[in-house]
Amino acid sequence: MGQKINPVGFRLGVTQEHRSRWFADPNRYPQLLQEDKKIRDYVRKNLSNAGIADIRVERKADQVELEIRTARPGVVVGRGGAGIDTLREGLQALLKDSSRQIRINVIEVERVDADAALLGEYIAQQLERRVAFRRCVRQAIQRAQRAGVQGIKIQVAGRLNGAEIARTEWTREGRVPLHTLRADIDYAYTTATTTYGILGIKVWVFRGEIIPGQEDAAPSNVGQPRRRNQQRRRQQFEDRSNEG
C-alpha cells in the first residue's frame, strides 16, 4: 500500500520525525491539536512570500516553541528581528493568551530545489500565472535534478490548461521507492487557484536511502561540483527573547 498512504506518516519513527512534539492530558488533546493547525495556517498565510517549507511545534509547560524552515529567512526575521516580534504578537492574539510565551526559531532550508513543499509551491505559482502545466512540471523536475535528488514524481489534477473535463496527469524521473522504509521520501500536497478552478499538486522527492548509523553523514553534492567552494553558511535565527 505504499502508493496509497502518506509517505511521511508511513515513515514516522523510522526516517521522519513528528511535526508536533508535545504531550498533554487526553482532555486537552483536541484543543492543542486545533491550536497547532491554527498556528500553521496563520504563519503560512502571513508569510506566504517567504517560502515556508515546514513548521514544527513543541510545547513545554506554558511555552510554545516554533521551528520554521524557510527558503527566505530574511523575510521571516525582518529588519532587526521586527518580523519575529510582529509574528509573535499576532500568534498571541490568535491564541487569545498574551501570557503564553512563544519562541520562534527560523532555519534556512539547505537545498531549496530538493524540498517537496517548495517545489509544489513553485508549480502552484506558475500555474496561477497561466503557464502551461507540462512546462511547469518539466522546469520543477529540472530544478530538482540539478539539486541532486535521486528521483522525483509530480502529479497535477484538475481542469488542466482550462480543459472542460478534469483529469489527472503525472510524471516521474528517476527512482521513487515508496515501499522502502529507509528511503528518504519527502512528500507535499498543495493547491493552485486558477480562473478555471482549483488544481491539486502532489510532489514526491527521493533524496536517497538512510542507512542506520549514517544519518549524520554529509549530503552528497551530486550535480553541484562547481559550487563546492561557494557554499555559503546556512542562516539560522534562534529566538532568545524570553530568556531571563
Swiss-Prot record:
It holds the Pfam family Ribosomal_S3_C. Signal peptide: none annotated. The keyword rRNA-binding applies. Transmembrane segments: none annotated. Keywords: Ribonucleoprotein, Ribosomal protein, RNA-binding, rRNA-binding. GO terms for cellular component: cytosolic small ribosomal subunit. It comes from the Bacteria. One of its GO terms (molecular function) is mRNA binding. The keyword rRNA-binding applies. Residues 215-244 are annotated as: Disordered. One of its GO terms (biological process) is translation. Residues 39-110 form the KH type-2 domain. Residues 225-234 have a biased composition (Basic residues). NCBIfam families: rpsC_bact (TIGR01009). Belongs to the universal ribosomal protein uS3 family. Part of the 30S ribosomal subunit. Forms a tight complex with proteins S10 and S14. Binds the lower part of the 30S subunit head. Binds mRNA in the 70S ribosome, positioning it for translation. This is Small ribosomal subunit protein uS3. It comes from Synechococcus sp. (strain ATCC 27144 / PCC 6301 / SAUG 1402/1) (Anacystis nidulans). The lineage of its organism: Bacteria, Bacillati, Cyanobacteriota, Cyanophyceae, Synechococcales.
